[in-house]
């Protein structure tokens, strides 16, 4: 009303086989975590959020591009540097949040990253099976001709890596070290530009989509974000010290082995 613009996420349970139980849980968690952070770090989250329609609709403040907000990394290098530094500062601050175990369980903030990533056997499958390596190399070679130059270089790096078992073994060792890390830092757990609204004029930064929030090892949020920035073609060298190298290693096998799965088809899920 009164010309106010809001952002809305809705779960249509009729489209989902389990009546949307999981997705409704995500909306509930997103709202609850946002409200929790409004009390401690209000500058980092939406100013207003509310569940409606028996939990099927999540409404929140809208940070529209017409009001100066960016939902993609800035194209200007100097602004991009401010953007990256601001995000890194924010995720560092969020890591300090300490909550009682009862609240962690109530909000479903239990750790999962080290188990899901560090104990994933994707990298070991790649090392052990020459056919898997050949299939991966073939896939990347097929991608090469139609890629931008920067992505062609990245594909070539992966192709060369897949030919070097010693380097793959080192990555496997580092990934297993990630599984041993303490998960004592609060993390958004999906820190990427799609979930960030940045206002270059005011320097404000808002993180949205808190349904993956959890406790994780130190540097997890920065690592997620810097990988996303590199994917967008930004130079992240000044922030290499922020990376959790073992987490980065765990990404390699996790995503490579899953790239062999058949392409997703339209179905009864949201992603």
Regions found by a protein language model. Name each.
Residues 218-270:
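Active-site activation/catalytic loop segments of kinase-like enzymes and analogous catalytic loops
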Residues 11, 52, 64:
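Residues forming the ATP-binding cleft of Hanks-type serine/threonine protein kinase domains
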Residues 1-3, 7-8, 167-220:
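Active-site acidic catalytic loop and adjacent metal/ATP-binding pocket
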Residues 59-67:
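Short pocket-lining segment of the protein kinase catalytic domain that shapes the ATP-binding cleft
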Residues 36, 67-111:
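Conserved kinase catalytic-core helix
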Residues 6-49, 77-90, 220, 229:
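A conserved alpha-helical element in kinase catalytic cores
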Residues 47-57:
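Short beta-strand micro-motifs within the conserved protein kinase catalytic domain, predominantly
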Residues 97-188, 199-201:
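An alpha-helical support segment within catalytic cores of ATP-dependent transferases
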């Amino acid at each position: 009303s009164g010309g106010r613009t809001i952002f809305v996420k809705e779960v249509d349970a009729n489209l989902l086989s389990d009546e949307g139980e999981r997705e409704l849980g995500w909306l509930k968690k997103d709202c609850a975590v946002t409200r929790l952070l409004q009390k401690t770090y209000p500058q980092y989250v939406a100013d207003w959020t509310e569940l409606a329609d028996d939990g099927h609709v999540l409404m929140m403040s809208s940070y529209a591009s017409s009001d100066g907000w960016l939902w993609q990394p800035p194209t200007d290098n100097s602004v991009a540097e401010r953007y990256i530094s601001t995000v890194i500062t924010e995720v560092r601050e969020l890591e300090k949040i300490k909550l009682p175990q009862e609240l962690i369980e109530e909000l479903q903030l239990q750790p999962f990253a080290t188990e899901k990533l560090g104990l994933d056997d994707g990298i070991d499958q790649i090392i052990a099976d020459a056919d898997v390596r050949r299939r991966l190399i073939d896939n990347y070679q097929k991608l090469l001709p139609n890629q931008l130059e920067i992505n062609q270089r990245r594909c070539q790096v992966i192709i060369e890596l897949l030919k070097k078992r010693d380097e793959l073994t080192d990555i496997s060792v580092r990934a297993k070290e990630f599984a041993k890390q303490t998960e004592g830092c609060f993390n958004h757990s999906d820190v990427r530009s799609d979930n960030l609204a940045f206002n270059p004029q005011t320097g404000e930064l808002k993180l949205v989509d808190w349904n993956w929030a959890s406790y994780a090892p130190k540097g997890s949020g920065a690592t997620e974000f810097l990988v996303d920035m590199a994917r967008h073609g930004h130079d992240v060298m000044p922030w290499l010290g922020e990376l959790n190298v073992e987490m980065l290693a765990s990404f390699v096998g996790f995503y490579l082995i899953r790239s062999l799965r058949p392409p997703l088809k339209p179905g009864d899920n949201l992603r």
